[in-house]
């Protein structure tokens, strides 16, 4: 049987990377102009894949609007293939909802141009999450084409079935030699073309499961090769033993599907780095970018969209266009070169502007919600709406920032008086809040005493006692188990001779810790919260020496401030650490020696929980990159021996390390000065141009937030607390209160362990969309409860299109029975009346 050799013409377009956006955009305009010219005169130049992302169309047409019809014509013809993404994202550093919105937007734009390429194309993403098959199937994509994170060889073939934990499957096609395995085929004449095709095809045959070979004719920012059809015809006439032809990814996958029964099954994350680096240091490069991204995702997903739904159901217009504009700015920052922090300094400065735009739009939209609930009136009586973004009833802290704090008390929705604690410019209290709902509080002027008790060394509540040590670390006694965790929150600093892509220790790696510092401490105790304040300096080497093999002798003091907070009725210790970074070429982490011995860590992932073994990965000198013990996380990481456990939650700090002995390290900061370097200890080849990036040293003041959660049993006994820490109540300032607004309301309620990830208006109708997932391995039978009667409930896919004929007429009931299979992501479309 003949081999079919598919040559796929494409380009990989990094929107911004070693040059800023506008320069790469100028090149993009030239490239697409060239492409359209070739397609207009060369009928045999059949296909060109525009990198799986649609933002390039927007970028191009902003400069060349006159080319819109010609571009649309070539896309409709199937000669230019676009989508399914808006941008090619990093997967681990963005939320699951961000990935879904990315695909929704890519689908919308593609449909405007007449055609969507249904290929799960991720040519250069730095590893892949285990739930990607389920996400892709939610968009009717049954395949995945990728490069990094997998090593194809004689045993592990380049085509396989990739299965998510819920059972969703896609046909995965690995590109063993990259998305550039056949670039510049024609630039030196036919003889070189002939030699390259034969060499590359013969090499790939040893990895293939089917009789199909994929030659990717393109690379970063390359133009189409006009002579390609001519050379293909000459080659085919000369070598009839194989079939060489101009193809595309859709045609290639159609051929592979014919042999689907022969493909082996693989489950889990794709993070192998034997042949292709996954560049694991990107998890902590330019940490300020990660923190900004997380804040913007939380703003849109947890506050703006659900509160806009709430006001929409009360009669306000849903601001779809503005919400989508905010999402576009956010998604533009989630390219793998952007969110990873691996570009030149100019790029990341421009990213901060886009994050600012997201926050400006988000806060404006929340202000619009507040104005609507206030009836656009003001009065001396000040009302505050406090919203709970979690789908269960919480008891948690509420913070209200206010200028004038003299003689203030609160009245809750039932008329109960609350005397909050006052810390600096904040009112702080603890209260219960309804699921996906709110309470209205009223500010009242009343004489009150400001009582703030002090002692030197400890704070406690019903669950935990926290004692501060001389070095600023803490011991936590869990009153429920009687177990004490000692010396938690030790700072550990070491040299970093790497670059924006990889941590790499210098040959002589001086480690500095806070174990022996003498800290200044004091405590404050209120009715609802007690705090320990810690101050010390960390004496750190200024930078690496010129040989980059050791840290400098000269040292500078870097001030550290830590605030430990313990709230009444809440079994966790919230930590805010402020670090003034005055030095370069280093990595700063915090250590939590829990003493819990385990062979695995459980980690919050995308729409679920990832189980990772705690054993050193085996490797040898043939590996292109050394596997690192640092791994990605979303909201939390947990160690448990089955009887007790310790969870560490975080806000926008995606890198951790866990050991079998029970140590957890959380990376706070990684300071480097180069986009890429060669000859690293941890990576054999350079990952990009060797360019200095002084702003990646991250000098200045940094603020980190994380929470310590001792618990009984496994992660399921603590993850609600972690999510409450990350997704805290949102306070909206009202003037007067609109007459028909209830003072307390739960819009929807869904019992844990199910987790709601999205509450928004439908993309195509006036209905409401709610998305949730089952993070456990058991089937859950429960009910979704609604404050407003439901008329119809329909299960839809991630595109918000019906999965099957499953419309349920609710006859204005307020609850719907659900049976949710293990690890499933479920999206429901709800038809409901407006609130009168």
Language-model features: locations:
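N-terminal catalytic cores of secreted or lumenal carbohydrate-active enzymes
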Residues: 1-97, 101, 109-111, 138-141, ...
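Structural recognition of the beta-strand scaffold that forms the well-ordered cores
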Residues: 7, 47-50, 81-84, 118-121, ...
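Catalytic grooves of carbohydrate-active enzymes
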Residues: 8, 12-18, 23, 170-374, ...
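The substrate-binding groove and active-site-proximal loops of carbohydrate-active enzymes
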Residues: 11-28, 51-61, 84-100, 115-127, ...
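Alpha-helical scaffolding within the catalytic cores
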Residues: 33-34, 62-75, 101-102, 152-168, ...
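Surface-exposed loop and adjacent secondary-structure segments within mature catalytic domains
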Residues: 69-79, 129-184
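CE4/NodB-like, metal-dependent polysaccharide N-deacetylase domain
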Residues: 99-138, 196-214
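C-terminal (or distal) subdomains of carbohydrate-active enzymes
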Residues: 132-135, 156-158, 174, 186, ...
């Amino acid at each position: 049987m003949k081999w079919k050799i598919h040559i796929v013409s494409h380009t990989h377009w990094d929107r911004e990377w070693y040059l800023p956006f506008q320069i790469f955009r100028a090149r993009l305009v030239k490239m697409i102009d060239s492409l359209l010219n070739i397609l207009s005169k060369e009928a045999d130049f059949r296909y060109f894949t525009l990198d799986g992302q649609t933002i390039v169309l927007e970028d191009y047409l902003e400069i060349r609007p006159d080319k819109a019809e010609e571009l649309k014509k070539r896309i409709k013809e199937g000669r230019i293939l676009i989508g399914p993404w808006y941008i090619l994202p990093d997967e681990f550093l963005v939320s699951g909802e961000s990935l879904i919105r990315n695909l929704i937007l890519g689908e919308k734009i593609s449909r405007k141009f007449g055609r969507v390429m249904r290929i799960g194309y991720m040519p250069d993403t730095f590893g892949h999450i285990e739930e990607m098959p389920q996400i892709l199937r939610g968009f009717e994509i049954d395949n995945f084409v990728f490069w990094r994170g997998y090593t194809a060889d004689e045993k592990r073939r380049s085509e396989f079935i990739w299965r998510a934990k819920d059972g969703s499957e896609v046909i995965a096609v690995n590109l063993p030699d990259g998305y550039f395995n056949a670039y510049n085929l024609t630039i030196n004449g036919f003889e070189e073309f002939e030699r390259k095709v034969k060499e590359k095809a013969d090499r790939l045959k040893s990895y293939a499961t089917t009789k199909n070979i994929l030659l990717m004719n393109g690379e970063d920012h390359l133009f189409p090769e006009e002579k390609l059809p001519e050379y293909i015809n000459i080659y085919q006439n000369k070598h009839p033993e194989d079939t060489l032809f101009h193809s595309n990814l859709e045609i290639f996958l159609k051929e592979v599907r014919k042999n689907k029964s022969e493909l082996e099954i693989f489950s889990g994350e794709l993070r192998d780095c034997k042949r292709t680096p996954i560049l694991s240091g990107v998890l902590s490069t330019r940490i300020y970018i990660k923190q900004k991204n997380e804040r913007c995702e939380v703003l849109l997903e947890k506050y703006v969209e659900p509160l806009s739904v709430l006001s929409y159901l009360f009669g306000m217009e849903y601001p779809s266009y503005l919400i989508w504009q905010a999402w576009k700015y956010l998604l533009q920052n989630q390219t793998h070169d952007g969110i990873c922090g691996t570009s030149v300094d100019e790029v990341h400065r421009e990213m901060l502007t886009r994050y600012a735009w997201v926050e400006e739009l988000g806060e404006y939209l929340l202000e619009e919600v507040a104005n609507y609930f206030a009836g656009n009136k003001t009065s001396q009586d000040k009302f505050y709406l406090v919203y709970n973004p979690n789908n269960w009833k919480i008891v948690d802290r509420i913070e209200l920032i206010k200028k004038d704090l003299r003689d203030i008390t609160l009245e809750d929705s039932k008329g109960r008086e609350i005397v909050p604690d006052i810390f600096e410019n904040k009112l702080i209290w603890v209260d219960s809040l309804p699921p996906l709902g709110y309470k209205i509080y009223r500010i009242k002027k009343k004489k009150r005493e400001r009582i703030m008790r002090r002692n030197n060394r400890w704070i406690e509540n019903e669950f935990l006692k926290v004692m501060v040590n001389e070095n600023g670390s803490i011991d936590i006694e869990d009153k429920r188990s009687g177990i004490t965790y000692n010396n938690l929150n030790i700072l550990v600093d070491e040299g970093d001779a790497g670059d924006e892509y990889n941590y790499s220790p210098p040959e002589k790696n001086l480690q500095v810790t806070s174990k022996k510092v003498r800290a200044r401490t004091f405590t404050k105790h209120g009715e609802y919260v007690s705090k320990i304040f810690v101050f010390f300096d960390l004496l750190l080497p200024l930078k690496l020496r010129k040989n980059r093999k050791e840290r400098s002798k000269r040292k500078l003091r870097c001030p550290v401030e830590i605030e430990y907070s313990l709230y009444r009725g809440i079994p966790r210790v919230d930590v805010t650490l402020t670090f003034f970074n005055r030095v370069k070429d280093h990595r700063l982490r915090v250590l939590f020696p829990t003493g819990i011995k385990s062979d695995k860590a459980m980690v919050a992932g995308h729409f679920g929980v990832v189980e990772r073994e705690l054993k050193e990965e085996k490797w040898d000198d043939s590996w292109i990159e050394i596997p690192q013990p640092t791994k990605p996380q979303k909201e939390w990481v947990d160690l448990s021996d089955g009887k007790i456990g310790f969870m560490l939650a975080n806000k926008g700090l995606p890198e951790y390390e866990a050991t079998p002995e029970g140590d957890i390290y959380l990376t706070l900061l990684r300071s480097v000065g180069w986009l890429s370097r060669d000859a690293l200890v941890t990576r054999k080849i350079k990952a990009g141009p060797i360019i200095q990036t002084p702003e990646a040293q991250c000098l200045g003041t940094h603020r980190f937030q994380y929470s310590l959660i001792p618990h009984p049993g496994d992660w399921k006994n603590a993850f609600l607390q972690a999510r409450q820490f990350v997704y805290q109540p949102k306070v909206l300032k009202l003037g007067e209160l609109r007459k028909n607004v209830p003072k307390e309301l739960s819009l929807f309620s869904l019992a844990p362990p199910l987790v709601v990830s999205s509450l928004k208006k439908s993309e195509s109708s006036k209905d409401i969309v709610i998305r949730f997932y089952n993070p456990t391995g058991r089937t859950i039978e429960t009910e979704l409860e609604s404050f407003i009667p439901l008329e119809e409930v329909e299960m839809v896919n991630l595109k918000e299109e019906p999965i099957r004929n499953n419309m349920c007429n609710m006859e204005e009931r307020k609850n719907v029975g659900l049976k949710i299979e293990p690890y499933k992501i479920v999206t429901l479309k709800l038809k409901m009346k407006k609130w009168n």
